Amino acid sequence: VILGMVKNINIDYISGTSSGSIVATLYSIGYSPSEIYNFFKHYSKDITHIGFKNIFKLISGLLLKHKIIIDGLNDGKKLEKIMYKICAKKDIYTIDQINLPLLIPSVNIENGETYIFTSKKIRNVYQDNYVYDNSILVSKAVRASCSFPGIYSPCHYQNKILVDGGIRENIPWKGTKKLGANTVLSIIFERTLEPDPFLDILEIITKSINLLSHELSLYEQSGSDYVLKINTLNTSLLDISKIDFLYNLGYSSMNNFLEKNNWNKKLCKFE
């Protein structure tokens, strides 16, 4: 998607939720679309790896204590370490060091507050149940936004327990406009849910969250100026074998969208 955009339009603002926060962050600190693609090719197995240790803890907890004693199948620490290393190569550590306006949402699971991590300061308005922060480590912000419930453990930050931003801000157009964007293009990835009587625990979790995110997206997209929906067919959250397919699908979908709207290097401010 990013590759199709940079060839045709100027991206002046960028935001991303969950795995989209990885793409948004890498682009905002200067990595090219091809470098972002190579990042996912190289690190996807590490990011999505579910270790034997967590599986053992899950099983032993169920057998011995008759309860679930883990808060996720992946603790998220590997993702945070990888992002820290990748950002350090650009001499970027905290989010306020990023020049391109960037926004990454997460959710405080304890009280439902939406935590918005931004590279530019936004004044907190307490009535809207949002908390803005521009001092967090970039790697920590990405980990928080990617903490998909049940798959990744929640991220602890300043005595808060943060999880995937997609729970409340699947399309973060509000914060992007608060950063200063006049025109927002939102990218929505939709998955075709096919009947399957043999679902494992991961599929049950991911399909449940996907359904929730889909309904939330329908509600939220009205605030975006433009919306591009991309159907990823039956590709699951952890299916890293489909990276090439998704890369090409995103590129062709964006090109078709831009051609349909007759855009060619327009000076626009896009999410």
Identify the meaning behind each predicted range:
Residues 1-17, 25-271:
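Patatin-like phospholipase
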